[in-house]
Amino acid sequence: MDKNKNISMAVIKRLPKYHRYLNELMKNDVDRISSKELGEKIGFTASQIRQDLNCFGDFGQQGYGYNVKELYTQINSILGLDKEYNAVLIGAGNIGQAIANYTRFDKLGIMITAIFDANPKLIGIKIRDIEIRDIDELGSFLKSDSVDIGVICVPKKSAQRVSDELINGGIRGIWNFAPIDLAVPKDVKVENVHLSESVSTLIYQLHQQR
């Protein structure tokens, strides 16, 4: 993939869904699938799927469709999931613990190497054999260990400070669960997961049905 190619984030955000469904097809021993069949499964049009995939190359054959395993492997590579990424998790409350316990991350190549929190009652507790450390140790850890992703699960009032420390420590990817839009340099990539916004969208849809 040409990294300088201008591909919209809308296309990029659809790729994980293709990736997930193709993985399910492989588990069910499906060897090939047409764009029409794939679209029916995931709720996209066949034309949309072809346009998305054409951004990265020519994967299908007319009259044959897509080789499921080959397409899965290609999307896996496009998304960078064929590599490993070290992550640190800051905030070991309910959301943080749920993320730390999510075993699917290992299969995506994301390795949580350390967990930090400010609560003395949590420090020393282990989550999947990873001991929760004092947040004051974060800076020194980032200096001594290679980390790619910072996962922020702290309260809103602490999120920007934590983000700044992660960035100062060399991290260029932040997965933010705090209900705040972080101020970061242009070379730092942030993916926000604002739960209240997500559920508000659902509530709106339910409200429209009443």
UniProtKB/Swiss-Prot annotation:
InterPro entries on file: CoA-bd (IPR003781), NAD(P)-bd_dom_sf (IPR036291), Rex_DNA-bd_C_dom (IPR009718), Tscrpt_rep_Rex (IPR022876), WH-like_DNA-bd_sf (IPR036388), WH_DNA-bd_sf (IPR036390)
Regions recorded as binding DNA: 17-56
Chief location of this protein within or outside the cell: cytoplasm
GO cellular component labels: cytoplasm
Alphabetized GO MF terms: DNA binding; DNA-binding transcription factor activity
Pfam families: CoA_binding, Put_DNA-bind_N
Localization, UniProt: Cytoplasm
Role summary: Modulates transcription in response to changes in cellular NADH/NAD(+) redox state.
Protein name in UniProt: Redox-sensing transcriptional repressor Rex
Encoding gene, per UniProt annotation: rex
